[in-house]
Amino acid sequence: MTMELLCFSYACSSQNPEMVEKLKHSNKILLPESLLFELTKDNHDSLENKLYFKVSHTETEYGEVCGVHEFSAPPGVVHVPYHIMNSCSIGEGTNVKIELVAPPKGDFVKLRLHNSKEFSKLSDPKAVLEKIMSQDYPVVTQGQTIALHYPELDKVFMIDIVETQPTEIIEILNADINVDFDIALDYDEAENTEPVESNESKSQTRDVSSSIANYKLTYDMERFPGKGNRLGSN
């Protein structure tokens, strides 16, 4: 199933502010009720599972696959998170192509944190990552950058989807996925090399230097072991 709709961000929607705040840092969209009617009329098999649609620029044909939050958008309109519109060069009120797709369950994903030092300060970063991704990003595409909002601290963590398997677009909801981490964008190799200092200076800074030097090991092996994590259960 394919159709064209007018695309607007959540900032242009009449939805309640709580819903807008929840969805703007996700890849979930709002579609018109008429589309659900068409799917029901056709007795589409996908209704038994989660629905995913590729939102594409009609001229460049570049797009991203999104999940559906509700069928509550006005007739002829799709509401899309602004960060997805921006990555696809889609402006407010632009015609977009909406195409029903069925990505396979993923079995591997490699992630790259933009700000690993802040993320690793969370009490349980692995649990936070799994919970937010399964809630807000049920499907991911290799090469995209996602924005994870952690409401308890009101922080947004940017994460690159470096690699996915078995295909470039995968569903992560209820999937047993091996998670690996690429070197974070804020990783500074110079910080992990202990400088040559006098014995007195080394004594004064031993604890701090040791902490920094072992940061990458802690980040890779203890905070984010990345083996067979089940991302999502809803």
Each language-model region and where it sits:
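Beta-strand/loop-dominated core regions that host nucleotide or nucleotide-derived cofactor-binding catalytic loops
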Residues: 1-234
